[in-house]
Amino acid sequence: MKLLENKVAIITGASSGIGRATARLFAEQGAAVIINARGAEALEDVASAIRQAGGRVHPVAGDVTVAETHARLTDAAMTVFGGLDIAVNNAGAVGATKPLAEISVEEWDHVITANLTSAFLGVRSQIPAMLKRGGGSVVFISSFVGTSAGIPGMAAYGTAKAALMGLVKGITADYAFKGVRANALLPGGVDTPMAGDAAQKEWAAGLHAMKRIAEPEELAQAALFLSSPMSSFVAGSALFADGGNAAVK
């Protein structure tokens, strides 16, 4: 039996990178997936690939910093596929990369909203739907930046990603006894457009004990673990998938 047979999942930031790899893997493992990104055309490309592979998918384009987008995602899960069991809140943005004192209030607000407020807006909509099914799994894509390591010029991003652990702990305290598990996945460098050019990827690889960055599919496998029955007693936790960065920093 497939790990996510008869499950329904929402995945944000699904048009590229970790989100796209996660959407395709979850569909392969039997889940019906509601996928989201801002760009409708790129999102439809992912949906088409999933359909061609025999998967069930429904794309919903929209900005995750807007509450109405999350309402549409959850409504689609309920009306198209009958409920919601899993949410992978992956969408985010690095934003301005400069020393902290040089960051404008507007730049700060953008990064916090894109990475933290968007996640709050997501779970505020997702959790009530999960409770109707007796529980579910929420996964936040955080980062090793701000949690195990500070990176020059990335104070805003690191702060936002570290704060996701506060959401994880709060959801666990409020809802774990009702069957909703929340966990964070903390990647190191990953070969995605967000990782930058070849020189930046080489620099990131040097931060990790494994001396390479991850493929998006490797992070999708970790997200699958946190979303599946394999992690049924894992709640309120941070799973580092950082190539050993936390061990050698």
Model-derived segments and spans:
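Substrate-binding pocket helix/loop in short-chain dehydrogenase/reductase
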Residues: K98-L100, E107-I112, A204
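A conserved structural motif in NAD(P)-dependent oxidoreductases
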Residues: H208-L219, M230
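Residue(s) in the substrate-gating loop at a strand-loop-helix junction
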Residues: S143
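Alpha-helical segment proximal to the catalytic Tyr-Lys
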Residues: P128, T147, K169, A173-F177, ...
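Conserved glycine-rich cofactor-binding loop
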Residues: V8, S15-S16
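Short C-terminal tail/terminal secondary-structure segment
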Residues: V94-T97, L224, A235-K249
